[in-house]
Amino acid sequence: MSKAGLCLLAASTACGVTRAQDVNVPYSTPKVFSGFVEYSNDSSHMLLGYADGRKITAVGASFEKRSFLKQNLAGSWVAEVRPFMSVTDPTMKGISLEFPQEPSYSGIVSFSSAVPVDKPVTNAPLNVILVTQNHVYAGTATYIAGTRSTFVSAFSPLGYKVSLLPNKRFQPFVTGLGGFAVSPRDIPVFNSSAFNFTFEFGAGVQIYRTHTRSCQLEYRYHHLANTGGSAENPGIDSGVFKATYSFGR
């Protein structure tokens, strides 16, 4: 065999080995740092919470440390921090009164501060009766709705993630985390708590651009409540959409 043929054979063998190694290299790294954004447009009674109509927005970071790696399965410990998180509650700002009978009266009773409510108030007029000076007046009362936003900081140190097909660019995964959230005032209603516990679980897909860079799209069930430590504890159940960009090492 000529020298040229030997060189060509060696080059082909080297390329084949390189491709085989690339195929076998997992898209999984021992440590992963990530940044993410989250949004939930509404809350409702999904499992435990009863505070409806809440919106949640969050920006945060996470750290993953791999615990095991197999051919078709990988697991990692996860911790997340949310230095910026906003919880928007529906409120009642006042009551609009209408009494058409003579002497007619209409006016607005405004509260000194908006009152957060368990459920968004309806704008449908309610029939009411006013008795004064031996006269009875029939009219309507309409609640005036509003919102308030509270900035929250949250930390979830206890989490775990299981990924399928760690050798593939597209990896389905499931996650579960537990932690707490701290706010400057009670959420979601008065007399609840400024310190709440959180837990969440969800599923998504991780898409690798390279062996160390990836994007994640995920949907989670998120619960926030004070576990009965205060007079009020309606709790918030939210369906959260999450987008993450990750750097592996």
Q: Could you tell me what each predicted segment is?
A:
Residues 18-67, 238-248:
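Short glycine/proline- and aromatic-enriched beta-strand/turn motifs that initiate or cap beta-hairpins
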Residues 20-31, 66-77, 165-172, 209-215, ...:
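Short loop/turn motifs that connect adjacent beta-strands in outer-membrane beta-barrel proteins
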Residues 24-29, 204-249:
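Predominantly the C-terminal beta-signal and adjacent terminal strand-loop region
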Residues 29-31, 53-59, 149-156, 170, ...:
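Residues that define the transmembrane beta-barrel architecture of outer-membrane proteins
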Residues 29-37, 57, 75-81, 172-178, ...:
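Transmembrane beta-strands of outer-membrane beta-barrel proteins
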Residues 37-43, 57, 81-89, 178-186, ...:
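Transmembrane beta-strands of outer-membrane beta-barrel pores
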Residues 45-51, 142-147, 185-191, 226-233:
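Extracellular loop and loop/strand-boundary signature of outer-membrane beta-barrel proteins
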Residues 57-185:
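Gram-negative (and chloroplast) outer-membrane scaffold detector with strong preference
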